[in-house]
Regions:
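Subset of outer-membrane beta-barrel
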Residues: 23-337
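Sec/Tat signal peptide C-region and signal peptidase I cleavage site
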Residues: 17-22
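Bacterial N-terminal signal peptides that target proteins for export
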Residues: 1-8
Length: 337
């Protein structure tokens, strides 16, 4: 009986804390959640204000499905800018939940960056973010060895769990983005992001007797938009990400087809394919109507995990809207498109 109790408790702790340590947001369309990718992407867009939202539902066919949501807003502060650069601020909210214990993470972060205009075509934007995070779980959903009454499992006996149900911590991230831009439809970005700079503790124990620091996450990325013709653009995205022993490579290619290029009725569709190497691939489609952008993709697992998911990874949705003020006649903004 004591051996059974010990084994069940150990199994619970391994599953619980293993998930807690490795859990971080993962969007297949990483390029459509820019403030999660790097604080250096704060304010790097065509317009004055940007609002974005992202949603992902993964692995509905298995008991431990994941739900992820992210929302952000970032702005360019022209009054603190000059012909040499521009100050940008952002606000980010993230939430995800997974598993029978409903392990969740809520994060709200403030971001700041400054876009330095190196010359007419080149821009460098370093950025930083500070966030308040709270992890929660429901110990009442746990089952442990003490619920064995000698004959059978008895759910009426409260589970004995050696941890609290929440943990809060402050988290910092830094990053930088470099943009080379020849025109509205010809530019590329190269950048880096470093999340969990000071490796905050995320243990659920009252008196921690093991390390549960959140490992630093490095992201290195590249994004390209290149006009192939008057009504066709090629878009390429790539990212390498590493967090402790875990790493991944994401690739994406799109054709952007302009259906109407009139400034008042600007309309384009994106058709693309992407992959998370070694795990899944996905088809994607997007619609851009002037300053509104909506995209969707569906992950299809091809790794060994497909035996559990039947290949159905999950749906991912993104939406973005960019606002633009009409500047005074003599005003010349930082020309990041």
């Amino acid at each position: 009986m004591n051996v059974l109790r010990l084994n069940l408790t150990l199994a619970l702790l391994i599953c619980l804390f293993g998930s807690a340590v490795s859990q971080d947001l993962h969007f297949s369309q990483h390029f459509n959640s820019p403030l999660n990718l790097s604080p250096g992407l704060t304010g790097v867009f065509n317009g004055d204000y940007r609002v974005t939202g992202s949603y992902k539902s993964q692995w509905k066919t298995v008991p431990v499905d994941y739900l992820t949501f992210s929302g952000a807003v970032d702005i360019k502060l022209d009054q603190y800018g000059s012909k040499r650069g521009n100050l940008n601020l952002g606000l980010l909210f993230d939430y995800d939940q997974a598993g029978d214990l409903e392990l969740s993470l809520a994060n709200i972060a403030g971001l700041a960056s400054y876009s330095f205009r190196l010359n007419k075509k080149n821009f460098l934007t370093p950025g930083i973010s500070m966030g308040y995070n709270q992890r929660r779980l429901k110990p009442g959903n746990a089952t442990t060895g003490n619920q064995w009454n000698g004959f059978e499992f008895d759910p009426a006996i409260p589970a004995e769990v050696p941890f609290v149900d929440n943990n809060s911590f402050v988290d910092f991230s830094i990053g930088a983005n470099y943009r080379h831009q020849k025109g509205f439809r010809k530019f590329y970005d190269l950048g880096i992001g470093l999340n969990h700079l000071f490796k905050p503790s995320q243990t659920f124990e009252d008196a921690p007797n093991y390390e549960a620091d959140l490992a630093r996450r490095w992201s290195i990325y590249g994004m390209l938009n290149h006009a192939l013709g008057s009504k066709l653009d090629l878009i390429l995205n790539a990212m390498y990400q590493k967090q402790d022993p875990h790493q991944e490579i994401l690739l994406n290619a799109q054709a952007k087809i302009y259906l109407n290029k009139d400034s008042e009725r600007d309309l384009a569709v994106h058709i693309g394919l992407g992959a998370r190497l070694g795990d899944a691939w996905y088809p994607m489609v997007a619609l851009q109507m002037r300053r509104l952008y909506v995209s969707a993709n569906y992950d299809i697992n091809y790794s060994d995990w497909k035996n559990k998911t039947n290949g159905r990874g999950g749906l991912e949705l993104h939406v973005a809207y960019k606002f633009a003020k009409v500047p005074p006649v003599m005003f010349k903004p930082c020309p990041i498109y």
